[in-house]
């Protein structure tokens, strides 16, 4: 996408206005007519605390804005706000297309304005937020303003053990699509029972945002590492105005090269969308063939029952991994590709094969690089309410409070829908240290159902422990504590 004329990266220097409390914010702060001559400059992406605005706070499990007796969803009056502003240019040849503003990550509560009009709001800071902005922009110069509150109601679900800092943390960009375009797709790329032949399934949602019905066609090609086409398909469908239709493909491929940590073989999927015979867009994506299973082995435990193990491509797998946070002393939570690659190279040099995203989804590029390097990803929803602790009674953990079900579900769905097709995505996690209960029972069932016809990956949640809503339980922390607290020193 980045090489397309229908893509504009908005990273760089923006104008920035900061106040320690939202009460000190001028009423007309989003008016595009006001001067920004006395505003500061700020680098985007990059948290504002590492650029001289506000105070960075580190804490483990308390809410930094209400460390004692938290009362969700209430927030303090001394809630800092950062206002970002820059001009954007809408090319004339984007006219008649759908235009989107994409925020890859901003913390915490983000209000979006274009030319002074409110466009929308988002508060899931570690997932993408996307806004259709056709009716707010005109060809040529427009003014984009982001008003970001340091703390929002979403902060009650973002109580992770890391530096609590604020602002734009990932890329900001514009892109445009034809009215008749690809909306979403789902890739199944697993193996048959011989673990040699590949089972390839593709479902593509074609969307028509035009004013009249259109004949839409999806053509796909699957190419191996040498550029040879190993599978292809084409289907056409009539899509009414304002509607979405799905086309599906199913094919078995002999003797595929499998994807694993030891040999991360990738195929290239190229999807072409046509409208009335004319090419509208071309979308590439990497595909890896792997089969993920949890199943009994022939080896018996002391109780006479078979051991149950994790298998990849028919082989038992021992996970050797690390937790990873987004953190860099120069830019805060913004991680460049160069830094990501350094991390991955260190991991591979130390024979690691797994990375747990603690405790939120990472940037898209992170997953693409895991596909390339061969790392099993334990993806985790951006949910941790550790500051509420784990009491199942009313007023305790948010994980058992039905009033917070939608917030838990939205964050889980955001993670799943964005990341479901990456070959490295091996495990789903419902969150971390957020208690258990009704909300996590529901998110577990949702993910199991959503993934059952795609890759049927294990769904895990550490606070479930021995309850039914987790497919794996690995007491890693307690094991490390025991190992480090036995009073013996290794020589």
Regions found by a protein language model. Name each.
Residues 1-65, 143, 147, 151, ...:
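Accessory carbohydrate-binding/adhesion or oligomerization-edge regions at the termini
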Residues 17-21, 47-55, 74-184, 209-210, ...:
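Accessory beta-strand-rich segments of carbohydrate-active enzymes
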Residues 81, 139-140, 197, 240-244:
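Solvent-exposed, conformationally flexible loop/turn segments
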Residues 94-98, 137-141, 253-268:
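Short glycine/proline/serine/threonine-rich loop/turn segments at secondary-structure transition edges
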Residues 179-210, 301-306:
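Surface beta-strand/loop "capping" patches
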């Amino acid at each position: 996408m980045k090489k397309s004329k229908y893509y504009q990266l908005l990273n760089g220097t923006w104008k920035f206005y900061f106040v320690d409390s939202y009460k000190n914010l001028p009423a007309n702060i989003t008016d595009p007519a006001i001067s920004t001559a006395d505003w500061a400059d700020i680098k985007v992406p990059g948290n504002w605390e590492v650029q001289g605005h506000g105070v960075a706070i580190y804490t483990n499990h308390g809410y930094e804005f209400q460390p004692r007796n938290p009362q969700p969803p209430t927030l303090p009056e001394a809630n800092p706000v950062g206002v970002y502003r820059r001009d954007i240019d809408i090319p004339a040849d984007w006219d008649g297309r759908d235009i989107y503003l994409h925020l890859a990550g901003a913390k915490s509560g983000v209000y979006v304005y274009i030319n002074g009009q409110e466009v929308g709001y988002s508060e899931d800071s570690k997932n993408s937020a996307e806004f259709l902005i056709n009716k707010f922009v005109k060809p040529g110069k427009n003014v984009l303003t982001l008003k970001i509150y340091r703390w929002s109601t979403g902060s009650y679900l973002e109580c992770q053990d890391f530096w609590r800092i604020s602002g734009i943390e990932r890329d900001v960009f514009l892109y445009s699509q034809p009215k008749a375009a690809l909306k979403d797709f789902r890739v199944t790329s697993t193996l048959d029972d011989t673990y040699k032949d590949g089972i390839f399934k593709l479902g593509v949602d074609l969307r028509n945002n035009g004013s009249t019905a259109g004949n839409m066609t999806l053509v796909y090609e699957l190419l191996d590492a040498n550029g040879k086409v190993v599978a292809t398909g084409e289907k056409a469908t009539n899509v009414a105005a304002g509607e979405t239709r799905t086309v599906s493909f199913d094919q078995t491929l002999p003797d595929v090269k499998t994807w694993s940590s030891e040999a991360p073989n990738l195929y290239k999927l190229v999807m072409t969308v046509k409208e009335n015979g004319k090419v509208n867009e071309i979308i590439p994506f990497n595909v890896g063939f792997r089969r993920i299973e949890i199943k009994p082995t022939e080896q018996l435990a002391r109780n006479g029952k078979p051991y149950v193990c994790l298998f990849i491509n028919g082989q038992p797998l021992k996970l050797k991994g690390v937790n990873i946070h987004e953190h860099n002393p120069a830019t805060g939570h913004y991680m460049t590709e160069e830094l990501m690659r350094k991390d991955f190279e260190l991991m591979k040099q130390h024979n690691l094969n797994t990375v747990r995203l603690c405790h939120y989804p990472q940037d898209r590029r992170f997953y693409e690089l895991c596909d390339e390097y061969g790392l099993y990803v334990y993806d985790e929803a951006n949910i941790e309410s550790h500051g509420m602790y784990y009491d199942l009674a009313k007023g305790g953990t948010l994980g058992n409070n039905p009033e917070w079900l939608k917030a838990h579900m939205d964050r889980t769905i955001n993670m799943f829908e964005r990341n479901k097709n990456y070959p490295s995505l091996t495990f789903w996690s419902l969150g971390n240290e957020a208690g258990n209960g009704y909300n996590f029972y529901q998110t577990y069932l949702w993910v199991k159902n959503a993934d059952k016809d795609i890759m049927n990956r294990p769904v895990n949640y550490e606070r479930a422990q021995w309850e039914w809503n987790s497919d794996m339980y690995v007491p890693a922390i307690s094991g490390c504590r025991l190992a480090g607290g036995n009073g013996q020193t290794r020589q």
